[in-house]
């Protein structure tokens, strides 16, 4: 058994990042109540397994394309058979859903996200207009999942919304950067439909995320330390997207995409600061 191939199939780093997001989301929602750690560990394991299921499905459905573009991937390289990959993916989701029964609300969300992952892999990868929103939703949903695990989703809903709109913006920018390849692959995307105007759509979504970011302070969940931290992040967001709008080149799109990814992580730190120093 090639264990490394299984880790590659599920994209181990992505799974660890997602599970860490759920754990951090729960810590924020519980204001670092250590009594919730056991539930957060279970929630993180569920996210890891369901994320692995989704990533494995992507490789299963992308087999034809990967034979040409990524022949080193576990299935096209024959380090894993298609049958083994299928069995493993459904084992992951079965175990993940079983563990999620520790909390019925977590179970229902895990079922929902598993269905969304299956639909994305089978139907919406080539329709990025819908696919981008799905990716953004899945990215942000890990924070809500952590909040559900500890019984408080108020703050994590706001974190979810900020992450959703920031990641949605980033996905459109990435598509703008990859427009030629997507045309060859007959993919539907906002940049293919709208051209340079898609940069303005991405900018609008990111500005909306910035607009939402003060809500935890305004609603009294967090104090001034959060506000100061998130204003710094918002300025970085706005500078990056302004540079792209001013110069909508592929080079600037790459910079803007990287900037959003980095600053979104800084926003997560701002939420941590807000939770710690309320």
Swiss-Prot record:
Pfam families associated with the record: UbiA
Keywords on record: Cell membrane, Lipid biosynthesis, Lipid metabolism, Magnesium, Membrane, Phospholipid biosynthesis, Phospholipid metabolism, Transferase, Transmembrane, Transmembrane helix
Membrane topology summary: Multi-pass membrane protein
Entry cofactors: Mg(2+)
Catalytically driven reaction(s): sn-3-O-(geranylgeranyl)glycerol 1-phosphate + (2E,6E,10E)-geranylgeranyl diphosphate = 2,3-bis-O-(geranylgeranyl)-sn-glycerol 1-phosphate + diphosphate
Enzyme class: transferase
Record's keyword annotation contains Transmembrane helix: yes
Subcellular location(s) per record: Cell membrane
Pathway assigned to this chain's UniProt record: Membrane lipid metabolism; glycerophospholipid metabolism
One Gene Ontology molecular-function label: magnesium ion binding
GO cellular component, as recorded: plasma membrane
Main function: Prenyltransferase that catalyzes the transfer of the geranylgeranyl moiety of geranylgeranyl diphosphate (GGPP) to the C2 hydroxyl of (S)-3-O-geranylgeranylglyceryl phosphate (GGGP). This reaction is the second ether-bond-formation step in the biosynthesis of archaeal membrane lipids.
PANTHER family to which the protein is assigned, alphabetical: CHLOROPHYLL SYNTHASE, CHLOROPHYLL SYNTHASE, CHLOROPLASTIC
Homology family: Belongs to the UbiA prenyltransferase family. DGGGP synthase subfamily.
Protein name (record): Digeranylgeranylglyceryl phosphate synthase
Protein species of origin: Methanococcus maripaludis (strain C7 / ATCC BAA-1331)
């Amino acid at each position: 058994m090639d264990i490394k191939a299984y880790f590659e199939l599920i994209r181990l780093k992505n799974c660890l990042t997602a599970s860490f997001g759920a754990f951090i989301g729960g810590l924020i929602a519980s204001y670092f109540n250590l009594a919730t750690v056991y539930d957060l560990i279970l929630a993180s394991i569920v996210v890891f397994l369901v994320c692995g299921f989704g990533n494995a499905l992507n490789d299963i459905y992308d087999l034809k394309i990967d034979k040409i573009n990524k022949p080193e991937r576990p299935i096209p390289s024959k380090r894993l058979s298609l049958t083994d990959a299928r069995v493993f993916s459904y084992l992951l989701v079965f175990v993940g859903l079983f563990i999620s029964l520790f909390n019925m609300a977590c179970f229902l969300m895990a079922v929902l996200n598993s269905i969304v992952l299956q639909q994305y892999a089978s139907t919406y990868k080539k329709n990025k207009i819908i696919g981008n929103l799905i990716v953004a939703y899945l990215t942000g949903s890990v924070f809500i999942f952590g909040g559900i695990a500890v019984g408080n989703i108020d703050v994590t809903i706001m974190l979810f919304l900020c992450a959703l709109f920031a990641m949605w913006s980033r996905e459109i920018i990435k598509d703008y950067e990859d427009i030629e390849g997507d045309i060859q692959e007959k993919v539907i995307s906002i940049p293919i439909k709208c051209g340079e105007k898609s940069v303005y759509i991405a900018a609008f979504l990111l500005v909306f995320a910035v607009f939402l970011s003060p809500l935890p302070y305004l609603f009294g969940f967090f104090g001034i330390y959060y506000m100061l931290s998130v204003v710094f992040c918002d300025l970085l967001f706005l500078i990056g997207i302004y540079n792209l709008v001013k110069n909508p080149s592929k080079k600037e799109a790459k910079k803007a995409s990287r900037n959003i990814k980095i600053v979104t992580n800084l926003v997560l730190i701002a939420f941590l600061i807000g939770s710690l120093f309320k």
